[in-house]
């Protein structure tokens, strides 16, 4: 299973209260392959996740990947490899006989093409994590004896940085509307005399990540009922600027846009978790 936290930057993830994910393991600071949702997911759907420079399998693709396309001779083997004619890992899982389902919050997933086209089962929800979890659980129950690959793009950490349990969520406008920086347009650079870090918006993103920890707890509880091992990658697709160097939003280069969390772990058959990459490699059956 691949779960992306849209716009979640590494420092916001670290600040969030997330008892589930913190108990699972420590997220690595990874570097996104792109500065916005479409390009980052296009990369991940080719098997290229955000990159970590430490010499750890699955985190550093130069050591070993979770999954990859068989595009070059001599590459180190991945946990699962797909032929090029599958078009990407989603088509690869379908061709391999997996029950494949996905759900996306961001508008890039609204239309059938291009990010969704390989999914036989997909629901665009907008920012609604509870609905997304419900959808994936229903798809999980439909898999019968087939292996399963699930994808979730959670949108709560993306502007307007809101979730359905946040007080005053309807009034939150985010980086494209009236926020603390007073209607500064998205991706605009302010003169240095006006630079300031918008801690209020950053903390709203922190709160959204805390909220998603609980929703992932709901998801993993349901998956665990079947006592089937599930290998899971959770990562940010890109980060966000909250006023650093006079910049807001994403879709352009800045270190805070490239720094994202990544955590790879396994939900074991007995309901426990492991983030030991060697155990994952030995025991994993990607589900």
What are these regions, as identified by a protein language model?
Residues 1-287:
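Catalytic domains that recognize anionic headgroups
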């Amino acid at each position: 299973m691949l779960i992306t936290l849209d716009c979640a930057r590494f420092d916001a993830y670290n600040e969030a209260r997330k008892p589930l994910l913190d108990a699972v393991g420590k997220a690595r600071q990874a570097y996104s392959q792109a500065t916005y949702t479409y390009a980052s997911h296009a990369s991940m759907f080719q098997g290229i996740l955000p990159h970590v420079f430490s010499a750890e399998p699955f985190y550093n693709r130069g050591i070993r990947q979770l999954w990859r396309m068989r595009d070059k001779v001599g590459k180190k083997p991945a946990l699962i490899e797909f032929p090029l004619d599958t078009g990407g890992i989603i088509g690869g899982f379908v061709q391999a006989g997996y029950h494949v389902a996905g759900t996306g919050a961001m508008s890039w997933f609204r239309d059938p093409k291009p990010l969704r086209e390989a999914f036989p089962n997909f629901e665009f929800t907008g920012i609604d994590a509870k609905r997304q979890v419900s959808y994936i659980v229903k798809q999980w129950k439909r898999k019968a004896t087939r292996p399963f690959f699930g994808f979730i793009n959670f949108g709560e950490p993306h502007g307007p940085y809101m979730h359905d349990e946040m007080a005053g969520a309807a009034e939150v406008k985010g980086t494209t509307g009236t926020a603390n920086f007073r209607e500064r347009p998205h991706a605009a650079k302010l003169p240095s005399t006006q630079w300031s870090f918008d801690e209020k918006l950053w903390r709203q993103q922190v709160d959204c990540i805390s909220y998603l920890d609980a929703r992932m707890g709901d998801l993993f509880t349901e998956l665990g009922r079947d006592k089937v091992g599930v290998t899971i990658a959770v990562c940010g697709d890109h980060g966000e600027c909250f006023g650093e160097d006079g910049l807001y939003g994403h879709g352009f280069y800045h270190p805070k846009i490239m720094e994202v969390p990544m955590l790879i772990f396994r939900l074991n058959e007995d309901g426990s978790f492991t983030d030991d990459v060697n155990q994952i490699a030995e025991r994993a059956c990607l589900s």
